């Protein structure tokens, strides 16, 4: 089957295709990842592990520019020995402060970027998904500590394509499945908006992470091409 035929069949079957850019040994290689049918079916049935949110078909509308539906819910809740309650809140409503984002980037060791550009990137994103830790001390009404611990964002043409960028989780919260949940729910939000062709960029050390989420490399040998200035 030709790649064009594959894309057409995927479009009519609502099977999203996901691509991933890999950087290996200082060279940049583009990998295309097709979402496995089992993952898609689990999303459609709302049975994805650790997800309490049901997927709904987006309502029909005549408006050309429909903004993504904002979703906020508790992903994790735990009580510490001293009675402090911590909740991890997932949000797709773009509630990310640029200074908090810069601090999170510092924690994961990313190079600093100008605050004005960070603010522009957030403003111009189609979806900004975030994870916040909210801690409530025992017996202290109204006294909450809110901290950004994870983020991923997506840009889109609002019709067919979206690209996931800047996936990061606070090192103190890594290894708890939060990055996996963040990506799964961001994908789910995009699918709710009928965005079926999703791309992302991945460093070599996290390729397996995306494979475990159901990504498959290079369908039909598709490669990405990049242009860089010579000076």
UniProtKB/Swiss-Prot annotation:
Keywords: Acyltransferase, Cytoplasm, Nucleus, Plant defense, Transferase. GO terms for molecular function: histone H2A acetyltransferase activity; histone H3 acetyltransferase activity; N-acetyltransferase activity. Its EC number is 2.3.1.48. It catalyses: L-lysyl-[histone] + acetyl-CoA = N(6)-acetyl-L-lysyl-[histone] + CoA + H(+). InterPro entries: Acyl_CoA_acyltransferase, GNAT_dom, NSI-like. GO terms for cellular component: cytoplasm; nucleus. It is found in: Cytoplasm; Nucleus. It comes from the Eukaryota. Its main location: cytoplasm. Belongs to the acetyltransferase family. Interacts with the effector Avh52 from the pathogen Phytophtora sojae. Acetylates histones H2A and H3 in vitro. This is Histone acetyltransferase TAP1. It comes from Glycine max (Soybean). The lineage of its organism: Eukaryota, Viridiplantae, Streptophyta, Embryophyta, Tracheophyta.
